[in-house]
Amino acid sequence: MFTMKKSMLLLFFLGTISLSLCEQERNADEEERRDEEVAKMEEIKRGLLSGILGAGKNIVCGLSGLC
């Protein structure tokens, strides 16, 4: 009986460690995905901003005739 309790306790302990490691890995994956999404959004914002600035320069250049 005592040996069975020890082995069950050991299995519980190892299962808890395994679960904890899986949870940490999942959290790291989610954080990595969030970082990738933020990077994509920043790229899109930069692209839109440069497009707007380029169009603004063309308008000013066309209206003033100084280019």
UniProtKB/Swiss-Prot annotation:
Residues 23-46 form a propeptide. GO terms for cellular component: extracellular region. The keyword Signal applies. It is found in: Secreted. GO terms for biological process: defense response to Gram-negative bacterium; defense response to Gram-positive bacterium; hemolysis in another organism. Expressed by the skin glands. It holds the Pfam family FSAP_sig_propep. Keywords: Amphibian defense peptide, Antibiotic, Antimicrobial, Cleavage on pair of basic residues, Disulfide bond, Secreted, Signal. Disulfide bonds join C61-C67. Residues 1-22 form the signal peptide. InterPro entries: Frog_antimicrobial_propeptide, Nigrocin. Antimicrobial peptide active at least against the Gram-positive bacterium S.aureus but with otherwise unclear activity spectrum. Lacks hemolytic activity against rabbit or human erythrocytes. Belongs to the frog skin active peptide (FSAP) family. Brevinin subfamily. This is Nigrocin-2GRc. It comes from Odorrana grahami.
